[in-house]
């Protein structure tokens, strides 16, 4: 299990800062796919009408986890950057700190 605090003091590359400042940490989430992207328009056009599924549906999934991406926002100048972590099954943001001799709970 990976536990990351909600604030982190790290270097800010923004034009005004260029020094270590506190950053607000959030987890990156994928945005909604645009229906106007060229590939989506082409796919929808091909799918319309009779004839069933026209392109192969992917089934051979190899990975069991995704890499966690942190979004850091500077509290001073609002500059945002993204940092990727290693793969993990359990990710927690701002959870309680681990104490010695305590049992693991999920």
From Swiss-Prot:
GO biological process assignments: translation
Kindly give the Pfam families that the UniProt entry links to this protein: Ribosomal_L44
Residues folding into a coiled coil are none
| Keywords of the record | Ribonucleoprotein, Ribosomal protein
Q: Which GO terms describe its cellular component?
A: ribonucleoprotein complex; ribosome
Tell me the domain of life: Eukaryota
Q: Where is this region: Disordered?
A: 36-56
Q: Which GO terms describe its molecular function?
A: structural constituent of ribosome
What's the family? Belongs to the eukaryotic ribosomal protein eL42 family.
Q: Which PANTHER family match?
A: 60S RIBOSOMAL PROTEIN L36A/L44
| Stated name of the protein | Large ribosomal subunit protein eL42
What is the originating organism of this protein?
Answer: Coprinopsis cinerea (Inky cap fungus)
């Amino acid at each position: 299990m990976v536990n990351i605090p909600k604030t982190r003091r790290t270097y800010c590359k923004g034009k005004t800062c260029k020094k270590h400042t506190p950053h607000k940490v959030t987890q990156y989430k994928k945005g909604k796919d645009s229906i106007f992207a060229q590939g989506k328009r082409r796919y929808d056009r091909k799918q319309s009408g009779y004839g069933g599924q026209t392109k192969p549906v992917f089934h051979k999934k190899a990975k069991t986890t995704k890499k966690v991406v942190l979004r850091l926002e500077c509290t001073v100048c609002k500059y945002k950057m993204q940092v990727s972590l290693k793969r993990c099954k359990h990710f927690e943001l701002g959870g309680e700190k681990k104490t010695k001799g305590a049992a693991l709970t999920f």
